[in-house]
Amino acid sequence: SSVIIITTIGGSIQSTLTATMNSLGGNTVSAYVQARYPETDDEWETWIYPEMTDEDYVSQEMIDGLIAAYPDEVSGIAAENYLGGGQIVDPKDSDNYANVVIEGITPEYLDFMKLDMHAGRSLTAADNSGKKRVCVIADIMAERYFNGRDPIGEQISVTTSDGSIFDFVVVGVYEYNQALFGKIDPTIPEKDRSTQMMVPIQTSFKLQGSDQAGYEYFNLLLTPLADVDQATNH
């Protein structure tokens, strides 16, 4: 696969792109930010891997600029950020609960994962830029926890494993596909199995205290007619 440096960020960090064909189908370019390594033995002797700063991340503005420059080839980015595992407990019935894994995602991530919406809406760019406390939950979680009630517009409170409590408003329900999330543990009762709850990725950064404005790892999504090699040569 080809690798190309698209920009120099800060003084010691460079962004590289590796052209790949994603296993889920469709053209993607997997991107990551890493330090520029020393070129000589003398430099290696005193070199220390630098810490990331806000200026080192690939910003949303950079991504938007790339999409604007190549609208026929680039459709967006898919990125995720693990916020934590936790539990939602019905305040009126402690026996009614749901275990979730909170993932911060970009608006394009559900399409990237080939997940279809069941009800409501997906997360939007406005949700992301506004760092809104909204979420999209799995249909199987919605059916069990809300017991037939419409979950759209409902507020849920998640207590994470480290004791943090996060409140979100449900704006959408996606169709859960176990094949896309890996094997299940048959020893765990179905009621206790965790499902992924998606929130805006910028919201997840803020809740973690980092409040970073950019991305360290992401998948650049290319249109069906785009050529991967040509895209990485821009």
Regions found by a protein language model. Give the residues of each.
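Alpha-helical transmembrane segments
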Residues: 1-38
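Membrane-interface segments of envelope glycosyltransferases acting on lipid-linked substrates or membrane lipids
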Residues: 10, 66, 78-80, 194, ...
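Short amphipathic beta-strand/extended segments in non-transmembrane regions
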Residues: 32, 47, 51-123
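Short, well-ordered beta-to-alpha junction loops that form the rim of enzyme active sites
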Residues: 34, 80-83, 161, 173
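Structural beta->alpha junctions
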Residues: 35-39, 46-57, 91-96, 173-178, ...
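Extended serine/threonine-enriched, polar tracts that run as long, contiguous segments within proteins
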Residues: 44-45, 212
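Mid-to-C-terminal secondary-structure elements
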Residues: 108-122, 133-234
